[in-house]
């Protein structure tokens, strides 16, 4: 006759089976509280707010220059870049409107700062786009794409100066949503609208 040895694993399984069969099952045993959630998806509302923030930042640099000169404008631009762009994490794909080779692209914060306020001998062609007397900034989107924690927009930005003249630029942005919920620019391409020769 073959004998089955009562190994610890068999004993444990038997006890567990007995407990499960004898214990009354209730719905309460399986109830859990509201689950904690983490959502890293960027929303359209967040993108639109980030665009408004960019316009507000540009106007604040212009206002700082008008009221306090270059030093105040540079300090303000530093803050705007830290809040709006992701330079603290690495290079940003930034192609400003009015830059020329060999400094067309501005992947570093220093290059972006020079474009916005000028005054950097390493970027001698920059005169300070953001210190011009801008009074209004309006974003007009043609495309908004949402891809998880990233979003890309394409459209126009209309800038109005103190005399009421409007400058329109073609604008493409890519935004990233940080774990803390903040939205920053990782790609910024800007150019003047193309006019075909007649």
How would you name each of these model-derived features?
Residues 1-8:
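N-terminal secretory signal peptides that target proteins for export/translocation
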Residues 5, 18-20, 135, 144:
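Sterically constrained small-residue positions within well-ordered secondary structures
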Residues 48, 68-142:
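A solvent-exposed, acidic/Ser-Thr-rich amphipathic alpha-helical stretch
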Residues 30, 146-154, 158, 162-197:
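Short beta-strand edge/turn micro-motifs at domain boundaries
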Residues 8-9, 139, 170:
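Short beta-strand-initiation
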Residues 28-87:
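Short, low-complexity N-terminal intrinsically disordered segments enriched in polar/charged residues
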Residues 12-23:
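Bacterial N-terminal signal peptides
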């Amino acid at each position: 006759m073959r004998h089955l040895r009562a190994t610890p694993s068999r004993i444990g399984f038997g006890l567990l089976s007995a407990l499960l069969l004898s214990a009354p099952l209730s719905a309460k045993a399986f109830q859990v509280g509201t689950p904690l959630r983490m959502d890293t998806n960027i929303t359209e509302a967040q993108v639109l707010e980030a665009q408004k923030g960019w316009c507000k930042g540009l106007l604040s640099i212009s206002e700082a220059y008008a009221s306090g000169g270059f030093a105040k404008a540079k300090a303000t631009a530093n803050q705007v870049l830290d809040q709006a762009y992701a330079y603290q994490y690495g290079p940003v794909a930034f192609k400003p409107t009015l830059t020329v080779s060999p400094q067309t692209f501005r992947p570093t914060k220093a290059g972006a700062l020079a474009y916005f306020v000028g005054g950097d001998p390493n970027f001698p062609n920059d005169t300070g786009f953001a210190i011009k007397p801008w009074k209004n900034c309006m974003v007009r989107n043609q495309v908004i794409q949402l891809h998880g924690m990233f979003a890309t927009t394409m459209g126009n930005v209309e800038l109005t100066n103190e005399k009421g003249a409007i400058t329109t630029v073609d604008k493409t942005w890519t935004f990233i949503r940080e774990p803390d919920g903040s939205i920053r620019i990782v790609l910024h391409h800007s150019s003047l609208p193309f006019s075909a020769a007649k």
